[in-house]
Design a protein with these regions (language model features):
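Active-site-adjacent loops and short helices of periplasmic peptidoglycan-processing enzymes
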Residues: 1-133, 140-143
Length: 145
């Protein structure tokens, strides 16, 4: 599986959120039955919500200082496909998108994902690209987290 088909990197869109969740859970594991720590939405991200809505980005409505458990944030990321929560998870983990994206790219290299480049934690940026084979590698790793 993952050895046939186009090996040219193409934009992943929201599939990038699998790596966001993988990196976050690897570094902040949840125990069975736990909701994990509670984070709050930054004023900066709350202020960006109208812009994200205007661009048609997937999101959930948030307000500044709104609490989210780790589990609720991951559910919003993976079920709702909320771009704004992808950026919040990046901030909670690394302080900003750039630091988290560096971790995403380092993780891709560690896993052997040679055709993948991440440029943002949500996949909205078309510069985030990958191959089918690399996504199989990631999904196999994600199933072990």
């Amino acid at each position: 599986m993952g050895t046939r088909g186009d090996s040219v990197p193409t934009p992943t869109a929201s599939v990038a959120k699998v790596m966001t969740a993988y990196v976050f859970l690897r570094d902040h594991p949840l125990t069975a039955g736990s909701d994990g720590p509670t984070f709050t939405v930054s004023a900066e991200e709350a202020a960006r919500l109208p812009e994200r809505k205007a661009r048609g980005e997937s999101h959930i409505d948030v307000v500044a200082n709104q609490p989210f458990t780790e589990r609720a944030a991951l559910e919003a990321l993976l079920i709702v496909s909320a771009n704004n929560i992808a950026h919040e998870l990046a901030r909670w983990d690394s302080g900003d998108d750039a630091g988290f994206v560096s971790k995403m790219n380092a993780t891709a290299r560690e896993l052997g994902m040679t055709g993948t480049t991440y440029t943002d934690p949500s996949g909205y940026d078309p510069g985030t690209v990958s191959t089918a084979a690399d996504q199989v590698i990631l999904l196999r790793a994600a199933m072990r987290v």
